[in-house]
Amino acid sequence: MDCTQVGDISLQYAGDTDAGSRRDHNEDCFATEPRLGLWLVADGVGGHAAGEVASDLVRSTIIERVTAGDSLVDAITLSHDVLVREIEQREVASALGMGSTVVAVKVNGSEYEVAWVGDSRAYLFGGQLQQLTTDHTRVNELLAHGAITPEQAHNHRDRHVLTQCLGVDKNLQITPGRVTGTLKPGEQFLLCSDGLTDELSDTVIAGLLATNKSPKSQVDALIRAALDMGGNDNVSVVVVGDFELSEQDLETTHNRRRSSDASRSRREKFPFKVLALLTALCLLALWLLQ
């Protein structure tokens, strides 16, 4: 488990990804960037390892643009343009269907912004599980119009047909979803690819988050449960939020900060020591010349 201070709030986080039981490669990726207050999961699509390239390019572009000061929505939108250019430069066969979903959260103090494209999800957990994102899928559109029931949606043949996906169609107008809010004490974010939500119900996910008290144990338990249910797809999970630290975690965090403060203090004192030494040498030289 890693800890970071974002504004006036202390966050703990963990992330992991697994190829699953039926795939020979992993097209998912994730990022934990505490210096930016940024965490994300991307799920690549496309054959000939194109999905791996797509998700990695989306990840690196978003990190680069957020670092440069872009908003989260603008960074995601730009990653679509970057991916489209990459596809145009590749051979048709290797770039066929190349694209990626993404879900990301950016935290500034207790305020947060979640943005996404596709069916990778963000949840908020504080005893109860709340889905923050809305899947950009054909099935979700049918649900919204009352054309099918939630029960029909779960096994619908078009449940994985995306209406928004980065890179796949250069003519598609990408409109990332976006929600904002305030993170309350004891609440955590769960970011995941559909490899998790296809295997586990919200009830099961909530139970695993409730019974595991650290982000690392939550991530491990969720991925393990998805694999136990079949692991039919790559699965990626990131958990970040406000956890009550154990005494051991508090001591580790304190030691890291103390070590960092000591290193900074030594760096700050070093120029003065050099200046004092040079001054002493100059005085000695003047005395010898007399």
Question: Could you say what each language-model-derived stretch is?
Answer:
Residues 1-290:
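PP2C/PPM-type serine/threonine phosphatase catalytic domain
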